[in-house]
């Protein structure tokens, strides 16, 4: 998500009723090459907004809960959530709820160890900030803002942006980008979360600006002892995602599907006809918790796209939601 500054009681027991997914006999490995089908644009922004973008999605009680950034005609950013809906066809008619604070480039998840929902975002009172809630469907039911990360990065025109969070059995990890060809990581013991990761981070990937631009996401791959990272890149035909894998969240990352001609997701393999860009979004997770678990047997990707003829200032581009479904 690029920005040039001129960017009650749902969990009483901690038990989840998740959206039904097809039952499979065995776990699936990640494919070596990806091919998708795509929906068209699933919703238009309500009056006053030019775009809905930077999606974070969980499935809870058989419904999607989606948070997103918004922009207006002047390039000002805000944030919103959708009213819940059970399948993607319901997104168009779901309510669009403006938030009283700006949670730009949000990450939404349920932190199971402390039975609390967490919403993390950028451009608050610290480099990254978070709020907590017992009811993630209520766009304006969040706690006061707390610092998530207080560090700074160098060699970046935007500073640290596009955070994501993920946990294993012992630690929580913060990953983020900087529109500068680098992906960064910080960590803390899981017992200290939610809290402030502090000021220190390390570079875990380094490449050209175009190859590692923004919108990093990290997931646990169900049944595979593996983690998947996706990063948005700038290509000759639009935005696309490159993928990397690791066997430890604290370890090194190996390129997986990283070319524009054979990406994780992009114009070359998305199946989308309404957009050339496959941009900032979230893979659909198997549960809402901090493990950020995905199932390659049933993989979908909520992304932002736009009409290829739309141009001008990035911050006023007409981004809309779409969903990719992996061909198995």
Curated annotation (Swiss-Prot):
Subcellular location field: Secreted
Catalytic activity, as annotated: Hydrolysis of terminal non-reducing alpha-L-arabinofuranoside residues in alpha-L-arabinosides
Source domain of life: Eukaryota
UniProt GO cellular component terms: extracellular region
Keywords, comma-separated and alphabetical: Carbohydrate metabolism, Glycosidase, Hydrolase, Polysaccharide degradation, Secreted, Signal, Xylan degradation
Role of this protein: Alpha-L-arabinofuranosidase involved in the hydrolysis of xylan, a major structural heterogeneous polysaccharide found in plant biomass representing the second most abundant polysaccharide in the biosphere, after cellulose. Debranches beta-cellulose by removing 1,3 monosubstituted arabinose.
Name under which the protein is recorded: Alpha-L-arabinofuranosidase C
Native organism: Penicillium parvum
Encoding gene (name): ABF62C
């Amino acid at each position: 998500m690029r920005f040039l500054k001129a960017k009650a009681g749902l969990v009483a027991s901690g038990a989840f009723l998740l959206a039904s997914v097809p039952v499979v006999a065995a776990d699936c490995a990640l494919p070596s090459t990806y091919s998708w089908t795509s929906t068209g644009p699933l919703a238009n922004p309500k009056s006053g907004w030019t775009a809905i973008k930077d999606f974070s999605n969980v499935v809870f009680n058989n419904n999607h809960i989606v948070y997103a950034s918004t922009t207006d005609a002047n390039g000002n950013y805000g944030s919103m959530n959708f009213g819940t809906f059970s399948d993607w066809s319901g997104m168009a008619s779901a309510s669009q709820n403006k938030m009283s604070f700006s949670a730009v480039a949000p990450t939404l998840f349920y932190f199971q160890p402390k039975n609390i929902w967490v919403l993390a975002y950028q451009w608050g009172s610290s480099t990254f900030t978070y709020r907590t809630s017992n009811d993630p469907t209520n766009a304006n039911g969040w706690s006061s803002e707390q610092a998530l990360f207080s560090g700074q990065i160098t060699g970046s025109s935007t500073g640290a942006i596009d955070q994501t969070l993920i946990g294993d059995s012992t630690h929580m990890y913060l990953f983020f980008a900087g529109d500068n060809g680098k992906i960064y990581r910080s960590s803390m013991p899981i017992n200290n979360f939610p809290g402030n990761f502090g000021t220190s981070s390390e570079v875990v990937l380094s490449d050209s600006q175009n190859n590692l631009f923004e919108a990093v996401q990290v997931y646990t791959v169900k049944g595979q002892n593996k983690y998947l990272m996706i990063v948005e890149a700038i290509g000759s035909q639009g935005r696309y995602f490159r993928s990397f894998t690791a066997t430890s969240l604290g370890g090194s990352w190996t390129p997986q599907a990283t070319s524009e001609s054979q990406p994780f997701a992009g114009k070359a393999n998305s199946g989308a006809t309404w957009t050339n860009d496959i941009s900032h979004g979230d893979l659909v997770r198997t549960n809402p918790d901090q493990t950020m678990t995905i199932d390659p047997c049933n993989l979908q990707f909520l992304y932002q796209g736009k009409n290829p003829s739309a141009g001008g200032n990035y911050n006023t581009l007409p981004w809309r939601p779409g969903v990719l479904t992996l061909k198995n």
